[in-house]
Amino acid sequence: MTMNLINKKNLNIYLCGPTVYSDVHIGNLRTIIIFDAIFECLKNKGFSINFLHNITDIDDKIIEKAQELGISEAELTEKYTNEYFKILEIFNIKKPTKIVKVTEKIEKIIEYIKLLEKKGFTYYNKNNDLVFDILKIPNYGIISGQKIESLLDKNTKKTKSKNDFVLWKKTQKGLFFKSLFGLGRPGWHTECAALIYDYFQKKSLDLHGGGVDLIFPHHENENAQHFALTGNPIAENWFRSGFVNLNGKKMAKSLNNVLLAKNFSHKYNPDIIRSIFLSINPTVPINLTEELIKNHKKLIEKYQKICFEWYFDKKNEKTEKVEQVLNLFIEGKFAKANFLIMELIKQKENSTIRKIFLNLRFNFTKMRLDPESQEKIKNWNKLIMDKNYSEADKIREELWKIFKNS
C-alpha cells in the first residue's frame, strides 16, 4: 500500500461495512483489523484519523432472511449489527469515528441520486429502475484497470450496457421507501458513494478500503458516481486486502465453507488472527489452516513472554527502530516488518518490541503486573545478586501466573 501523505495530517478514510443479515466470518475482519493497526501507527506519527464505516441494513438478502424467519428487517438487522459491534470489541478493534446505517441516510441518498439525474447521468430501464449510464463517464474502468470498450457489450433487455448499474430499484418487496423515482430502495453502489459524498462534504477520500473482490464493479461504480458530480476521483489512495481461504478453499457462506468470527474467538485467542493478518502482506491471499493457527498461537505466547520480561529489564526503547517497523506496516510491507521484529527479539530489545506491539494493538499488551507485584521484582533482583536462583525462579513463576491472568 502506497499512500501520498505529503502535507497531510488529517486523513479521511472509508471502509465498506457488513451487510447485516448473518454473523461475519473471520475473513470479513481482515481489512478492519489491518486498518485498526495501521491507524494506530499513523496516530503515532501525528496523524488524525476520520474514519467512516457503514452498515448495510437494507438488501435483498436481508429481506429474504427476515421473511424466512418471520421477523421484520429492522429486527434482523438490529440483531446482527449488535453482534458485529460485539465482534469488534472481542477482537480489540477500535470503533470507527462514525458508523452509519444506510436506512438512517435514505433522504441523503435520494438527494444524491437527484443530483446525478439532474446532471444527465441517468435513465430508466425497462423495469423502471433508475440506472447510471456508464457511457457518460469517459474514464470508466480506471479503478479496475479495464478499457471501457471491453465493458460495453450491449444488453438490450434492460440497459444500454451490461455494466450500467441501478441507482434506485423500483420495488415494493420488503422494506421500501418513497421517492421521486417511485417506491423502492437505493442500489448498493450508490449507498456507499452517497454516504462518502455527504459525510466528507464532497471531498475525495485520502484512503478507501475494502477487499480485492470489490474492485469491480463496486469500487469502479462508486468512483464513477463521485466523478460525475465532482470531476474528481472518490479516493486518492486505495487499500484492498486479499482473500482469506479456509483449508485451501474460498471462504464463503454460499459454499458452506466459513469460520465465523465468534466461533474463532470461542476456540482461540483473538490475538492469533491479528498476528496472522499482520504477518502476511495485505494483498496476498491467506490460507487459514489449523497448522497456521497453531504456529501463531505459539508466537502469541512468545510475544506475551516478551511483554512480561520487559518488567525485569526496562531499558530504553530504540525510537528509530520503532518508527522503522511502524513505517513498514503503514506501507503494507508486513513480511519485512515481521523480519525486523524477529531481529529485535534475537537482540532482546524488549522495550522496543513492546512499543511496537502496543501500536499494533495486540490485546496481550493490556496484561499487567500491579504495583504490589512489581515490588516483588526488587526481591527477585536481590535473590539473583545473592545467587539464590531457585528462590528467584519461584518469584518469577509466581509473577508470570499473575501476569497471564491479568
Curated annotation (Swiss-Prot):
A motif ('HIGH' region) lies at residues 18-28. Its cofactor is Zn(2+). This is Cysteine--tRNA ligase. Its EC number is 6.1.1.16. The lineage of its organism: Bacteria, Bacillati, Mycoplasmatota, Mycoplasmoidales, Metamycoplasmataceae. GO terms for cellular component: cytosol. ATP binds at residue 253. Zn(2+) binds at residues 16, 192, 218, 222. Its main location: cytoplasm. It comes from the Bacteria. GO terms for molecular function: ATP binding; cysteine-tRNA ligase activity; zinc ion binding. The gene is cysS. GO terms for biological process: cysteinyl-tRNA aminoacylation. It is found in: Cytoplasm.
